[in-house]
Amino acid sequence: MKIKNAKDMDSSSIKLSATVYGKAGTGKTTLGATFPKPFFLDLNKGLLSIRGKNVDYVELYDSTWVEIQDTLDEAIKSPDHESIIIDSMGEVAEICMKHICQLNRRQKPEFADWDAFYQSMKSFIMKVRNSGKHSLCI
């Protein structure tokens, strides 16, 4: 067994991936702004805390599930950004469920809709995590 020292680790290929949950005003968005070359998908008008910083973002306040997916695909392809920040996953989940209900012509989700919701959210999160970029889901 070869003993290694942590100071010799090459971290250049390691991508940060995290989910942060907390009350409003606890610094989640500010944390996201510290990620390398971040790109924010802003779904809840919560970027006031990073106003004035050199951070790119797109407003997705009244977007559809398809628009969010398309924007994520563009962010993944962007050579100008090293990190994808989703703010907030709660909004993503609401829009996802709304989309599923619309597809099934329902006003409210029924038992059968929850599996589709789970699969859609899992796919979305895996796409973010496996994007080859740093990622933070708020």
Locations of regions flagged by a protein language model:
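Conserved P-loop
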Residues: 2-95
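P-loop NTPase motor core
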Residues: 83, 88-138
